[in-house]
């Protein structure tokens, strides 16, 4: 780690079709082996399907799906006197988005549909309807934080 100065976070360029930084980040998370154009094709196709199903614009529908998956609290391990506690902590906004996107992509990859675009569209549709694997993951994380509320005073 550099000691001289704090290095700022890299600015991510907005995606070419919608001009959204959030969507550009989502494409980057979905991308495998540096194949960005393939990832973009998959995302845009999935968003088109999502927009048709929901009746909203692509970006609006994506935002709703993402909002339903964003976690507000998570647990972090904290070692105190020989025992490890799962301490609930609030999630920072940037990490909130990153986790939500990662969970959606993971859930889509585990689905059994034909193409990745269809799997992603189905997962986003489920997320928008507050169901599906990604939403379940968020609820599990929240449940874990709720169960360990007693250790909240170990925060750092």
UniProtKB/Swiss-Prot annotation:
Pfam families: Ribosomal_S7. GO terms for biological process: translation. InterPro entries: Ribosomal_uS7 (IPR000235), Ribosomal_uS7_bac/org-type (IPR005717), Ribosomal_uS7_CS (IPR020606), Ribosomal_uS7_dom (IPR023798), Ribosomal_uS7_dom_sf (IPR036823). GO terms for cellular component: small ribosomal subunit. Coiled coil: none annotated. Keywords: Ribonucleoprotein, Ribosomal protein, RNA-binding, rRNA-binding, tRNA-binding. CDD domains: uS7_Bacteria. One of its GO terms (molecular function) is structural constituent of ribosome. The keyword rRNA-binding applies. It comes from the Bacteria. The keyword Cell membrane does not apply. Gene3D superfamilies: Ribosomal protein S7 domain. Part of the 30S ribosomal subunit. Contacts proteins S9 and S11. One of the primary rRNA binding proteins, it binds directly to 16S rRNA where it nucleates assembly of the head domain of the 30S subunit. Is located at the subunit interface close to the decoding center, probably blocks exit of the E-site tRNA. Belongs to the universal ribosomal protein uS7 family. This is Small ribosomal subunit protein uS7. It comes from Citrobacter koseri (strain ATCC BAA-895 / CDC 4225-83 / SGSC4696).
